[in-house]
Amino acid sequence: MTIKSLKDSTTHRSDDYASSPVVSTEPSYFANPVLPGFHPDPCLCRAGDDYYLVTSTFNWLPGVSLYHSRDLVHWESLGGILDKLDLRGIPESGGVWAPDLTYANGEFWLVYSVAKTVSGAFKDVDNYLVRARDIEGPWSEPVLLGAKGFDPCLVHAQDGCRLVLPQWDWRPLEGHYKFNGLLMYDLDVNTGKTGDPVRIFDHTGDTPCVCEGPHIMEHDGWFYLLAAEGGTGVNHRTVVARSRTVDGYYVPMPGNPLVSAAGTASPLIKSGHGNLVEGPDGAWYACHLCARRLPGAETCPLGRESALERIEWIDGWPRLAGGGSEPSAVVPAPMGVVAGTVTESYRPDTSYATSFAPAAISGARNG
């Protein structure tokens, strides 16, 4: 069986994690995705001058992939985080979902879901917390969190930690939509016990939809919520809301979404799900997942990948630096970072061909 090889026309690839920066004239740019291949559900974390990016691997080990950078452009793999993960019997597209990595009080904190089933009306999803003083471990024993939902988010507030979970409610009630909003709980990080839930957000727009993958950060006196809407297909998007208090309610940003490729010509389809960090030069960046199709096909053999976008703060809201919400294949690098010369077009290497139908490729890896 011969597998088709893909390559793009960039003269610099951000997946050359350990390579030295390419000498280039200013301004410098990098190509998206910064983590090509199977890197869904990205989450960025800054600790001092270091940046870490985690992605999920679903029903494959290591469960959570970990990368390190000092400039947001050149990334080095640090392996995985979860060394006590049992994925035996986990179905395809189950396993670890949407890791959320934060740094607070001198510790790294990771919350994540383990989905044991993905079929039927009810999903069995457990949520866990691990933490460590050093990003490379040792990590604590997993603490099972006492609230049901998926895609957990940990918020470090002055008066204690909060846990945020999107929640399903499958009761067959008339006029009831299955998604039950984003719920916030007080959390005892040592025992996993939670307080009573408070609904902090529903969705943007007038039509009910599932809102997932939440991340909350504090900036300039506001708490900002970033979340994913539109499912995981071509209508996927990142939306923003904010509140003066950590407990909400979070009000949607005018002109949502922040990032979406829906209805655009961007090669980075299915873009959405991510969070924000301040770069080494003071500029802000948003991470998000994306996927790239084969020309003339619906298939995305490399799965969902991780990308970065430049952000500007306008009237107290984060916006894409180029305007609109369309993700960019080429993005300005932080000032002083030499990332190389890139071009926007992605071309397949047609000297190879597949001997199997695209439908035979794993659906989860196709994104």
What are these regions (language model features)?
Residues 1-367:
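Carbohydrate-active catalytic/glycan-binding domains of CAZyme proteins
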